[in-house]
Curated annotation (Swiss-Prot):
This is Fructose-6-phosphate aldolase. Gene3D superfamilies: Aldolase class I. Belongs to the transaldolase family. Type 3A subfamily. It catalyses: beta-D-fructose 6-phosphate = dihydroxyacetone + D-glyceraldehyde 3-phosphate. The keyword Lyase applies. Catalyzes the reversible formation of fructose 6-phosphate from dihydroxyacetone and D-glyceraldehyde 3-phosphate via an aldolization reaction. The gene is fsa. The active site is at K85 (schiff-base intermediate with substrate). It comes from Salmonella schwarzengrund (strain CVM19633). It is found in: Cytoplasm. Homodecamer. InterPro entries: Aldolase_TIM (IPR013785), F6P_aldolase (IPR023001), TAL/FSA (IPR001585), Transaldolase_3B/F6P_aldolase (IPR004731), Transaldolase_AS (IPR018225), TSA/FSA_arc/bac (IPR033919).
Length: 220
C-alpha cells in the first residue's frame, strides 16, 4: 500500500518520515495557503524532505481545461514526476484526458461520488481521491462510497487506484484500507492520533516499574 501525509509542513514531514513508511506527500491549495509559503518555494522543500523516491502531489488552480493543462506542465517542469491533482469537473475530466496523452500523471480530486471517481479513472487519472469525511458531513456515507468506487475501479479501470482522503479519525482510514484501498493520505492530526496510544504508554510504565522494583535500575 501507499501511505501519504496530507500537509505542506516540512518540519512535520521530516519528523513523521522517521516513524511512518510514507510514500510521499499530498497538498492542496488550502494546505499550501495555510503554510504562508509560495507553492514554488514549498514544493522543492517537501520533495527534499521525502527524498527522490517520494511522490509529491500538487493541485492546479485554473477552472478551464486549457489552464489546468498549462499549470500541470508548469508543476511538472518544476518537480519532475509530480502527480498533478485535477478537480473532477467537466473541464477537469477534459484536462485529465489531455494530460494522460502528454504523459503527466494525474489524480482526480474533490470526488464526492463513486460515479464521479470512475469517470476520472476512465479519463486517465492514475489516482482518484474520494473525500470520506466531507461526504459524511453532507449526510452521506463516505466509507460506502469508497467501497463502491473501489469495486468499480477493480472491474472497469484496473490501472487506476483509490487514494482515499479527508479523514477525521484513524477508524475512517482503516475502514478504507479494509475496503481494499491501496493508498490513503493522512492529515497530520489523524497521523498523530494513530501514534497517541495511552494504553500502550501505561503498559510500558508498568514494565519499567516492575523491572526497577526487581533490579533497581532500567538497564538490561
Amino acid at each position: 500500500m501507499e501511505l501519504y501525509l496530507d500537509t505542506a509542513n516540512v518540519a512535520e514531514v521530516e519528523r513523521l518520515a522517521r516513524i511512518f513508511p510514507i510514500a510521499g506527500v499530498t497538498t492542496n491549495p488550502s494546505i499550501v495557503a495555510a503554510s504562508k509559503e509560495s507553492i514554488w518555494d514549498v514544493l522543492p522543500r517537501l520533495q527534499n524532505a521525502i527524498g527522490e523516491e517520494g511522490t509529491l502531489f500538487a493541485q492546479t488552480m485554473s477552472r478551464d481545461a486549457k489552464g489546468m493543462v498549462e499549470e500541470a506542465k508548469r508543476l511538472n517542469n518544476a518537480i519532475p514526476g509530480i502527480v498533478v491533482k485535477i478537480p473532477v469537473t467537466a473541464e477537469g475530466l477534459a484536462a485529465i484526458n489531455l494530460l494522460k496523452k502528454e504523459g503527466i500523471v494525474t489524480l482526480g480530486t474533490a470526488v464526492y461520488s463513486a460515479s464521479q471517481g470512475l469517470l476520472a479513472a476512465l479519463a486517465g487519472a492514475k489516482y482518484v481521491a474520494p473525500y470520506v469525511n466531507r461526504v459524511d458531513a453532507q449526510g452521506g456515507d463516505g466509507i460506502r462510497m469508497v467501497q463502491e468506487l473501489q469495486t468499480l475501479l477493480e472491474h472497469h479501470a484496473p490501472d487506476s487506484m483509490v487514494l482515499a482522503a479527508s479523514f477525521k479519525t484513524p477508524r475512517q482510514a482503516l475502514d478504507c484500507l479494509l475496503a481494499g484501498c491501496q493508498a490513503i493520505t493522512l492529515p497530520l492530526d489523524v497521523a498523530q492520533q494513530m501514534l497517541n496510544t495511552p494504553a500502550v504508554e501505561s503498559a510500558i510504565e508498568r514494565f519499567e516499574q516492575d523491572w526497577k522494583n526487581a533490579f533497581g535500575n532500567l538497564n538490561l
